[in-house]
């Protein structure tokens, strides 16, 4: 493959990262990663009812310790609540508080609706293709060893 295309793709990835930086200002102490966790909890609650730390970990392909830390931060800030399973001490359930649901409504649902209204010139198939390309590119490289100096 032409290395100029690879360079252009990397440049576009850097621009794509800037898109995430266009989020409205987040409440103090929250990061875009926290918003992603809140969104995932919301989706899993709608789909399954009860949400476990392991469910979030599986959905996001992130280690359980990382999710546990992020959920603990959300709980400490009042966006989520944690509860241990009555039958299995290894299981922790997570639910959004009203504060977490409001955060999800604004930073995910309302913001995504606003973004959608701004993209009138972009076809859905173009977004599908862009997302598929990024996922394929990542999958091709994630387990490869880059060259060493």
Task: List each model region and its residues.
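The alpha-helix within a helix-turn-helix
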Residues: 57
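Key DNA-contact positions within bacterial/archaeal DNA-binding proteins
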Residues: 65
